Design a protein with these regions (language model features):
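N-terminal Sec-pathway targeting helices
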Residues: 2-24
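An N-terminal hydrophobic leader/cap segment in hydrolases
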Residues: 22-52
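A short loop-to-beta-strand scaffold at the N-terminal edge of the catalytic core in hydrolase folds
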Residues: 55-66
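Conserved HGGG/HGGXW glycine-rich cap/lid loop of the alpha/beta-hydrolase fold
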Residues: 65-111
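Active-site loop/oxyanion-hole signature of alpha/beta-hydrolase fold enzymes
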Residues: 106-142
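Conserved hydrolase catalytic core segment
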Residues: 139-181
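Conserved serine/cysteine hydrolase catalytic core
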Residues: 219-319
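Catalytic active-site module of serine/aspartate enzymes centered on a nucleophile-bearing elbow/loop
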Residues: 308-309, 313-352
Length: 352
C-alpha cells in the first residue's frame, strides 16, 4: 500500500516537473517573441493611420488626433480600453468640424510603451500633458473621462484649471465609488492578480495569449474591427492602476475645489423597462424578458438610488457641473452616438 502511494506521488512529481520545464521554455519563447508580435500589430495600425507615438517622458504614448477643430476633446480610456482611438474616430463623424478628438492612452494600453514607474494619478496626468505638448496639441483642452479615467481628469482640472475649458465625465468613476478592500482575502486576491498580471506582461505571456485567442468584434467596429483587434493584441496594460486604485482616487478627491469650468456628467442609468430591452437588443441581438426584468429592478434599487445621489453630490463639489442621463451601455457613445454627440455640443455651447 505504501509503495503504491509513493509511486503515485512520484508520478505526480514527474508530471509537475515536466509542466514546470514546459512553462519555463514557453516563457523564454514568449519573451523573445513579445517585441515582434507587438510590432506586427503596430504595422497594421500604421497602415490605417492609428499610430502617432510621441514621448510622454519615460515611455512613448500613442496620441491619435481626429480633426483640426478649434475645440479639442482629450479622450482618456476606461480600464484596459483597447479600442478608444477607433471609438473616437467613429464618434467624430457625428460632430461638427470645429470639434476634434485627441485619444490618449496610458502605459501599456494599445501600442503605447511600458513604464517602470509607479502608476499614480500624478504620474498619469503629468505624462499625458507631456505627450500632448510633444504631439503639438495646444491648450485649452476639453477633458473627457471614461470610467477609470475619472480620477485623473478630476485631478487634472483642479491642478491645472488654466489648461481646461470644459470637462465631460462619461460614466466615469467618482467619489461615489467604494474603495477596494485593504485587508483579508480580497486584498490577497488583488495582490495576487497584480503579481500574476505584471509577470505575464513582462514575460510576454499576455502578448502571446492575445495573439492566440483575441478575436475581432465586427459588430461593434465594422471596417475598423481589425484595428481594434491589433490594439488589443499589442496591449500589455499596467497593473499599477489596480494596485494604486484607492490612493489614486484619494489623490483626486482631495484635490477638488469648486470652479467655474463647464462640466457635464453623463450617466447610463436605465429609466424604464424598455431602456433595458433596447440595451439587451443592442448587446445580444435579442431580448431575454426575465433578464430584462431583473436588470430593470436592479436599476431601481435603493442602493442604486443612493449611488446616484452620491454622484450628484460629487458633481456639486466640482462646481458648474450638469447631470445628464442617457440610458445605454457602459460606453454610452457606442449604443447612442447621436445623443452623446448632442451633449458634447451643448457643453461646447456653454464654453463659447
Amino acid at each position: 500500500m505504501k509503495k503504491g502511494i509513493k509511486k503515485v506521488f512520484k508520478v505526480i512529481g514527474r508530471i509537475f516537473l515536466v509542466l514546470l520545464i514546459l512553462f519555463f521554455i514557453l516563457t523564454i519563447i514568449f519573451a523573445c517573441m513579445k517585441k515582434s508580435l507587438r510590432q506586427k500589430n503596430v504595422d497594421i495600425l500604421k497602415a490605417d493611420g492609428f499610430v502617432n507615438l510621441v514621448s510622454a517622458g519615460d515611455y512613448d504614448m500613442n496620441v491619435n488626433i481626429f480633426g483640426n477643430g478649434k475645440y479639442k476633446i482629450i479622450a482618456m480610456p476606461a480600464s484596459w480600453d483597447y479600442g478608444l482611438p477607433v471609438e473616437m474616430k467613429q464618434l467624430s463623424e457625428y460632430l461638427d468640424d470645429d470639434i476634434s478628438f485627441v485619444a490618449v492612452t496610458r502605459p501599456g494600453y494599445g501600442i503605447s510603451g511600458e513604464t517602470k514607474k509607479d502608476v499614480t494619478t500624478e504620474y498619469i496626468v503629468e505624462s499625458t500633458r507631456t505627450a500632448l505638448k510633444n504631439a503639438g496639441v495646444e491648450t485649452p483642452y476639453i477633458l473627457m473621462a471614461h470610467s477609470m479615467s475619472g480620477p485623473y481628469v478630476t485631478y487634472w482640472e483642479n491642478k491645472y484649471p488654466e489648461e481646461i475649458s470644459g470637462v465631460i465625465f462619461r460614466n466615469s468613476i467618482s467619489s461615489a465609488e467604494d474603495e477596494m478592500p485593504e485587508k483579508g482575502v480580497p486584498k490577497l486576491m488583488k495582490n495576487a492578480a497584480v503579481a500574476i498580471g505584471t509577470f505575464a506582461n513582462k514575460t510576454g505571456w499576455t502578448t502571446a495569449m492575445n495573439a492566440l485567442f483575441a478575436e475581432e468584434d465586427e459588430d461593434s467596429y465594422g471596417v475598423y474591427a481589425k484595428d481594434v483587434l491589433a490594439f488589443k493584441k499589442a496591449a500589455v496594460p499596467n497593473y499599477g492602476e489596480v494596485k494604486n486604485y484607492n490612493i489614486n482616487m484619494k489623490t483626486a478627491w482631495d484635490s477638488i475645489q469648486a470652479n467655474d469650468i463647464p462640466k457635464v456628467y453623463i450617466t447610463n442609468d436605465f429609466e424604464t423597462l424598455e431602456d433595458v430591452k433596447e440595451y439587451l437588443m443592442f448587446l445580444y441581438g435579442e431580448v431575454d424578458e426575465e433578464l430584462a426584468q431583473e436588470r430593470f429592478e436592479e436599476s431601481q434599487s435603493e442602493w442604486h438610488k443612493e449611488h446616484r445621489k452620491k454622484i450628484s453630490e460629487y458633481c456639486k463639489s466640482l462646481g458648474n457641473c450638469k447631470e445628464v442621463n442617457i440610458p445605454a451601455s457602459h460606453d454610452i457613445s457606442d449604443q447612442k452616438p447621436e445623443e452623446f454627440a448632442k451633449e458634447i455640443e451643448k457643453l461646447i455651447d456653454r464654453i463659447k
